[in-house]
Structure formats: structure tokens, C-alpha cells
Amino acid sequence: MGLLSKKASCNTHGQDSSYFWGWEEYEKNPYDEIKNPDGIIQMGLAENQLSFDLIESWLAKNPDAANFQREGQSIFRELALFQDYHGLPSFKNAMADFMSENRGNRVSFNPNKLVLTAGATPANETLMFCLADPGDAFLLPTPYYPGFDRDLKWRTGAEIVPIQCKSANGFRITKVALEEAYEQAQKLNLKVKGVLITNPSNPLGTTTTRTELNHLLDFISRKKIHLISDEIYSGTVFTNPGFISVMEVLKDRKLENTDVFDRVHIVYSLSKDLGLPGFRVGVIYSNDDFVVSAATKMSSFGLISSQTQYLLSALLSDKTFTKNYLEENQIRLKNRHKKLVSGLEAAGIECLKSNAGLFCWVDMRHLLKSNTFEAEIELWKKIVYEVKLNISPGSSCHCNEPGWFRVCFANLSEETLKVALDRLKRFVDGPSPTRRSQSEHQRLKNLRKMKVSNWVFRLSFHDREPEER
């Protein structure tokens, strides 16, 4: 260890949480309907597998894009050599158009202000490098995505100060909570450089309201700080209220040519809306030319392959496909969400009312032995090791109330979801009085048998004892 850098040998990587531990346990014993039916079911993975068939169908109908051809001629060599280092113009244009379409075409995006990154993770980290120095802080509303402890802090040296949101108002962001977080940062001698939100929220599965967005814009205006809006779930909104991008609020308030406009930055990717996390496609959109320039230089450390850009530029440019995909995907998400909520209700478990995302924020406070985070982790361990479901405890999301859990629903089949819900219901119900009675009766019966057998054995032993001597 002495030969390694402090960065490599430190334990500030943010992965020492129950969120990542649950993944490790799942990987040791993954559920498989045939090969391992008693394994752990993965419900801690926010992955959208519900509409993969739509993309596969498009690929089958568009062999040129899938096979890296143009008018039937291979362009593999062209794509394999150096292209525009920071993005194919065709892909940037297609991405900007898709982002606008995804927001109801109520706002438009300039492709020249897009910075391409290998996913949303480096997009968020790059913005931290651009906006904060080591020791500076960003305010994040709780609960928040557990990976931010790694993504925002580890390499950048930035700090996170939580904006404490409460279940009493559905974990909404309030003026008071914003001010309290800012004051807390000052008490810690941390310079606040901005606020980062996920809209729709991960892990809540709710869209940020116009009122909240106005509070945030007023707040960053007063404090002269930045706002990062991570909008990677914007296409997963499956019921009202609809998604409102912060860009739409800026436009409605006619703030386009103000300093506030330049301090608002968007993060987007295709990992959630299109279910393509393996393609590693992320975007930074900023109104600040200096941020765009700096982020573009930094993006050299995590580029998107030319092959990926070529394929996706063709897919995103097919407006018939994108329109159908977004509509059908939302229908499927709504149906799957309904199945999860119904199954949880059958087990006596409620969820925060949600309208977006690939997960539910599940209320298991009534199952805790005590109102403590220790009790929450104890319950979580039972669910992982006994029920064999990997879900994410609220404490890993920095929720300030024990007993909440994030449960994902779009990464598994309907049949596997049913198995998971059946397991959870059996766990919550516990042994029924009838089963307990039968079990106790069987235990006493076995005990009597054992006593009789022991008595017979002893009797037989004493009868034989003289002979054996």
C-alpha cells in the first residue's frame, strides 16, 4: 500500500455502503428460475429492460445502422479511424433533438452547447471539476442516489451537504430546507458552489414540481451559485403530473439572457429512457461557454465510441421510432409500476405516490423493531439473506427517516417480480397461526417419538448389558 497514491489507498470512494454491499451479495448468489431458484433476486438495479424488443425490432429493420454501413457499403474503416474527437455532428444534432422531443418540444437544445461523456456518471463528475474546488460543497436534497457519494466526491474532493427533506410533505424541497442546508455548510466552513437535483428523483420516483424549481432558481440567484439538474429519467414519466425541465422554467420566466441562465446545467443520458446503460452515452448541457469549453477538454478522458454514435444517430433521427418508443415505454412502465404497488399492498406495504422512474420508494417503517437506522439495517439484512431480495435501504440514500427502501421493478421479468412479491408477502405475514400450530404439533410429536425411542434403547441396552460383559 505504501507504494500507492493516497487516492488509490484511501477509503473515501463512497462504495462502502449497503447499496453496494447488496449488489455484492446478489452477485454471489444470483437468482435464476431454473439454475438457482432460491437465489437472491436483484431489485437494487435501476435498469430498464421493459422495451428492449422495440429497439431490437428497429435494428432488424435498419441493417445499415446495425452493420455500420451507408447505402449498403461498409463504413467500418471510416468509423474505426479518428473522427471528430468530441462527437460526430450528426449524433450531437440527433441527441439535441431527442432531448427536446423528450420534453414535449417545449424547449430546444443547441448542439454546440452539448458535451458528450461516457455516461451520466462522468458527466456529473466533470461538472464537479468545472464548478467546484476540493473542499467546496454542493447541496443535495435527500434522499439521493447512493452513487453520488462516489461520483461527486471521490476524485474531485468536493463535499455533499444534505438538504433534509421529510416524508410529511412527500420529501419535497422547501425554502426552509434549502436555507438550513446552506447554513449547515457555513457552520462546517464549506463554501457552497451549487445545488444538484435529480428530476425525476432517484430514489423517490417523483417529478420535481414547478414550485420547487422556482424555489431553486430563486435560491441560486440569491446565493450566486450553480444548479445542476440531472434529468436522466425524464423519459420515464408514466402518469401525471408530467415532467417539467428546469430549462422550461427558465424560458417561462424569461431568464435566458441572465447570469442565472448561465449557472444552470443539465445532465442527461440514454441509460434509463432507452435502456442502454452498456452503450455509455451521457451529456452535459450548459449555457456557460466557459463550462462547455472546459468540460469538452475534460471529456477526452471518457469519450463515446464513433460506432456507438453512428448507430444511435440513426436511431434517434427516426422520429417515427422515437415517438412510438417513448409512448409505448411509458405504458409498460405504468403497468409494471402498478403490479409492484399492488403486490406490495397485498403484503400490507405502502409506497410514496410516484409517477416516474424505474423504482418505488417503499415504506417499511411498520416492520422495524425500533425507529432507528440500526433496526433498518437489521431488517434489510433479513430481506437480503432470508427473503433473498436485494433492495436499497433508505440510509444508503441518506434519508433522514429510518424504514424507507428503494425497490426497482423494470430490470426483471414479470414472472420474477411475482416470485419476489410472493417471497416478501410470506416474510411479512410470517408463519400463520395454523402453520405455527401444525409446526408445534409436529415438534411435540417428534419429541415424544424421540423420548420413546430413547427409553426403548435404554431398556434394550440394560437387557443386553450383562451378556456384553
UniProtKB/Swiss-Prot annotation:
<protein>
    <recommendedName>
        <fullName>1-aminocyclopropane-1-carboxylate synthase 8</fullName>
        <ecNumber>4.4.1.14</ecNumber>
    </recommendedName>
</protein>
<comment type="similarity">
    <text>Belongs to the class-I pyridoxal-phosphate-dependent aminotransferase family.</text>
</comment>
<feature type="modified residue" description="N6-(pyridoxal phosphate)lysine">
    <location>
        <position position="272"/>
    </location>
</feature>
<dbReference type="GO" id="GO:0009693">
    <property type="term" value="P:ethylene biosynthetic process"/>
</dbReference>
<keyword id="KW-0266">Ethylene biosynthesis</keyword>
<dbReference type="InterPro" id="IPR015422">
    <property type="entry name" value="PyrdxlP-dep_Trfase_small"/>
</dbReference>
<dbReference type="InterPro" id="IPR015421">
    <property type="entry name" value="PyrdxlP-dep_Trfase_major"/>
</dbReference>
<dbReference type="InterPro" id="IPR015424">
    <property type="entry name" value="PyrdxlP-dep_Trfase"/>
</dbReference>
<keyword id="KW-0663">Pyridoxal phosphate</keyword>
<feature type="binding site">
    <location>
        <position position="47"/>
    </location>
    <ligand>
        <name>substrate</name>
    </ligand>
</feature>
<dbReference type="InterPro" id="IPR050478">
    <property type="entry name" value="Ethylene_sulfur-biosynth"/>
</dbReference>
<dbReference type="GO" id="GO:0016847">
    <property type="term" value="F:1-aminocyclopropane-1-carboxylate synthase activity"/>
</dbReference>
<keyword id="KW-0292">Fruit ripening</keyword>
<dbReference type="InterPro" id="IPR004838">
    <property type="entry name" value="NHTrfase_class1_PyrdxlP-BS"/>
</dbReference>
<comment type="pathway">
    <text>Alkene biosynthesis; ethylene biosynthesis via S-adenosyl-L-methionine; ethylene from S-adenosyl-L-methionine: step 1/2.</text>
</comment>
<comment type="subunit">
    <text>Homodimer and heterodimer. In vivo, the relevance of heterodimerization with other ACS enzymes is however unsure. Interacts with GRF3.</text>
</comment>
<keyword id="KW-0949">S-adenosyl-L-methionine</keyword>
<comment type="function">
    <text>1-aminocyclopropane-1-carboxylate synthase (ACS) enzymes catalyze the conversion of S-adenosyl-L-methionine (SAM) into 1-aminocyclopropane-1-carboxylate (ACC), a direct precursor of ethylene.</text>
</comment>
<dbReference type="GO" id="GO:0030170">
    <property type="term" value="F:pyridoxal phosphate binding"/>
</dbReference>
<dbReference type="GO" id="GO:0009835">
    <property type="term" value="P:fruit ripening"/>
</dbReference>
<dbReference type="Pfam" id="PF00155">
    <property type="entry name" value="Aminotran_1_2"/>
</dbReference>
<feature type="binding site">
    <location>
        <position position="85"/>
    </location>
    <ligand>
        <name>substrate</name>
    </ligand>
</feature>
<keyword id="KW-0456">Lyase</keyword>
<dbReference type="InterPro" id="IPR004839">
    <property type="entry name" value="Aminotransferase_I/II_large"/>
</dbReference>
<dbReference type="GO" id="GO:0042802">
    <property type="term" value="F:identical protein binding"/>
</dbReference>
